[in-house]
Regions:
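Hydrophobic/small/kink-forming positions within alpha-helical transmembrane segments
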Residues: 26, 48-56, 78-83, 108, ...
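Loop-to-transmembrane-helix transition segments
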Residues: 29-59, 121-129, 174-192
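C-terminal transmembrane-helix exit sites in multi-pass transporters
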Residues: 33, 78-99, 171, 218-237
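Hydrophobic transmembrane alpha-helices of multi-pass small-molecule transport proteins
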Residues: 96-113, 133, 235-254
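Helix-helix packing/entry segments at the starts of transmembrane helices
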Residues: 16, 71-76, 143-159, 194-225
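Hydrophobic/aromatic residues within transmembrane alpha-helices
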Residues: 4, 13, 17, 61, ...
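Transmembrane alpha-helices of multi-pass small-molecule transport proteins
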Residues: 7-53, 132-135, 155-170, 245
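Transmembrane alpha-helical segments that form core, pore/gating elements
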Residues: 1-10, 25, 116-175, 182-183, ...
Length: 261
């Protein structure tokens, strides 16, 4: 969505993501005519706050560091969700989960590289995004106990559009015709991916579905190379591989535990 002086603010991109996704979801609601239950507005507010903050931070981080690095760091969100679930959901975490969380943290340190000449301060923004996305996952678990996936997605986009619309005027820059197209395309792609992912989790086991989400890193690295001519450094590749490996092990282990239960 532009570089240099022509680049749109991450807040404006976030606005586009929610604003243009909303009509798609409203049309889907008219076609599907789903049943709605009484929303838990307090938790929805927390979820939307995390979602808007996380999306904005991710967009901003991607303007400062390679897209592949931003994506890899974002995959820490299941680890953050695991830790937060202890305090919010009362879940108990075993030694294997803690080991995978520690391994993922090592991978993140390889990407961020604190205290070295290769230190990327902007990577901390992506780390913040992973943290709030982790919180969002925990809130989603709470909401899914009483509300349907479509209702959760629809409410999040309605509230997100309102919040983003309140912030956007302060950073507004008139988009070019192509940027309008890209804003709309970003929204449609993100809500479509969200719908596919939600339905995949509905019809398949999480342990089977979740590892496929890590293919995002491969696409991010490809887009870095194809669009921005950015080649990932070996240390970043290693850090990303460690994070992905720990996430896959955790997903597969949880799947086996669920089947035994």
């Amino acid at each position: 969505l532009g570089v240099g002086a022509d680049a749109l603010s991450p807040f404006q991109v976030t606005w586009g993501r929610f604003f243009f996704a909303l009509p798609v979801l409203l049309v889907a609601a008219l076609v599907m005519r789903p049943r709605f239950s009484s929303p838990q507005w307090g938790w929805h507010t927390v979820r939307v706050t995390c979602g808007v903050s996380g999306v904005t931070a991710m967009f901003y981080a991607a303007t400062l560091i390679p897209l592949a690095d931003t994506t890899a760091i974002s995959f820490l969100n299941p680890m953050f969700a695991m830790v937060l679930a202890i305090f919010i959901l009362g879940e108990k975490i075993g030694p294997i989960r803690w080991s995978m969380a520690a391994l993922a943290l090592i991978g993140a340190m390889l990407l961020i590289r604190p205290g070295t000449a290769g230190f990327q301060p902007a990577a901390l923004i992506a780390l913040f995004a992973a943290l709030v996305f982790g919180m969002e996952v925990v809130v989603l678990k709470l909401l899914s106990r009483t509300e349907s996936p479509f209702q959760i997605i629809l409410i999040a986009n309605i509230v997100g559009a309102v919040v983003a619309s309140a912030v956007a005027p302060f950073v507004w820059q008139a988009p070019t015709p192509m940027q309008w197209v890209l804003l709309a395309a970003t929204a449609v792609l993100m809500v479509t991916a969200q719908a596919f992912f939600t339905n995949a989790l509905r019809v398949g086991e999480a342990s089977f579905v979740l590892p496929f989400s890590y293919a995002t890193l491969l696409f991010a690295a490809f887009y870095d190379l194809a669009l921005f001519n950015v080649v990932p450094v070996p240390l970043s590749l290693l850090g990303g591989l460690i994070i992905i490996s720990s996430g896959i092990v955790l997903a597969l282990r949880d799947g086996r535990a669920a089947r035994k239960a």
